Structure formats: C-alpha cells, structure tokens
Amino acid sequence: MASRAGPRATGTDGSDYQHRERVASHYQMSVALKSEIKKLNIAHAVVWFLVAAQVLVSQLNLVSHKVVASPYQWEYTYLLSIIPTVFSFMALPKNNISYLVISMISGGLFCIGPILYGGMEMFPVAQQLYRHGKAYRFIFGFSAVSIMYLVLIISVQVHGWQIYYSKKLLDAWFTNTQDKKKK
C-alpha cells in the first residue's frame, strides 16, 4: 500500500515488529491481578453487607427472631473482615506494598479466623439438622445453619483467592522493584 507521496520507506511495511518494545510481563501480570483482586473485593463486600444486614436487623429488632435468626458469635468478628478489603482497595491504585501486606495478614486474621471458628461453632447444629431434620433458627423460612454454611463456603473461596492473588501481585511488584534496583 502506497502513501500519497509515493511508495513507503523500506522497513515500515509492518515487518519490523520484532524490534518494537513490549510491555514487561510483570506489568501485564500486575494489571490482571489487580483486576481479579478488585472483583474479589467487591464479592467480599457483598457477603460482608449481607452478614452486616443480618446482624443489624437482629440487633435492632427490626423483624421477629422467627424471620431472621439471631447471629452466631463468629458473625460479629467477621464484621471486622472489611478492614483487609479497605487496605486492599487502598493498596491497588499506587502499588502500595505495605497496605497489600497488611491486607494479606489481616485477611488471615479477620476473615479466615472467624470463618474457621464459625464452621466449628455451627457444626453441632448442622449435625442435628442433617441427622434428625430439626432446625431451630431460621432466616426467611430457611434453616439458618444451612444458609450460614453456604456463606462460609463462599467466603472461604473469596478470601482464599484474595490472599492467593495478593501474594502473586506482591511477587510481581517485587520483581518490578528488583529490576529497578539492578539499573
């Protein structure tokens, strides 16, 4: 294809792509991981909002305890799990390593810890439900223990992936800083 001024100059026919600069892989990985972490943070915020709504509705007696059961003990400590998500959101825009590390550590403490405790706290009630078919706590007509175990399963996956992707992102950021120190 020729230009208005005549034939193209040699070397501009598109075959010179091998000499062009490319985006370093750790930058590409950083963008992809940030996107995944943002999605997981939003998923966690939704789960957190649902747990917070149940605790708030129950504590303020907005509806009968027959409609929304009183919260389990682990749900109160799980409300602290918004802290790692806030630090994660603060870490992503400027690649702040300190905030990301705080998010990962507090994620284990405030997210995974209450979930493990909740699984153990609700186990006898779940065992009674599945052995004898008796449930004493309900959330909108459904067994509270079944709903809360579903919340636990979703939360474990969300927080596990958050910590995993945060670790991968941290590795990508450290690769970036190591490359800068070498120059």
Curated annotation (Swiss-Prot):
Residues 61-71, 121-137 are lumenal. It comes from the Eukaryota. Keywords: Endoplasmic reticulum, Immunity, Membrane, Protein transport, Transmembrane, Transmembrane helix, Transport. One of its GO terms (biological process) is endoplasmic reticulum organization. Residues 1-39, 93-99, 159-183 are cytoplasmic. It is found in: Endoplasmic reticulum membrane. It is a multi-pass membrane protein. Belongs to the jagunal family. PANTHER family: PROTEIN JAGUNAL HOMOLOG 1, PROTEIN JAGUNAL HOMOLOG 1-B. Endoplasmic reticulum transmembrane protein involved in vesicle-mediated transport, which is required for neutrophil function. This is Protein jagunal homolog 1-B. It comes from Danio rerio (Zebrafish). The gene is jagn1b.
